[in-house]
Amino acid sequence: MSATLRLLCLMACCVALAVANRPNYGGSGYGASYGDVVKAAETAEAQASALTNAAGAAASAAKLDGADWNSLNRYGWEQGRPLLAKPYGPLDPLYAAALPPRSFVAEVDPVFKKSQYGGSYGENAYLKTDAKLGVVAI
């Protein structure tokens, strides 16, 4: 009963949002026939969002460039979910296009970080399936 009520409320909210956000094209009066007026606040928000997304993508790429790709992929295969992580070089364009807006990599587990001495920290250790996730996104 409560699941049906929740579904009805969700549908009502979606319909209300769709009706409220409908643009008013073709109205009478000067300027209304060419669409909505662009507001300065919306333009500033869009620019700030784009800059935030670009900065987040660069920070995420820098964190993931320090990861040991072989350990990450081995962990993915142990979990039954192979990771599509390949060392293709700088990841800024990849993550700028692939990540959802304002979704950044928060941390990389120390097990998967590159060692300054050549190998990875967990190179000879077998990663257990109850290990922490390699990459956490917020």
UniProtKB/Swiss-Prot annotation:
Any one GO CC term of the record: egg chorion
Annotated keywords: Secreted, Signal
Protein name as catalogued: Chorion protein S16
Signal sequence annotation: 1-20
InterPro entries noted in UniProt: Chorion_S16
Subcellular location per the Swiss-Prot or TrEMBL entry: Secreted
UniProt keyword Nucleus present: no
Main localization category: secreted
GO BP terms, alphabetized: chorion-containing eggshell formation; dorsal appendage formation
GO molecular function: structural constituent of egg chorion
Function: Chorion membrane (egg shell) protein; plays a role in protecting the egg from the environment.
Family: Belongs to the chorion protein S16 family.
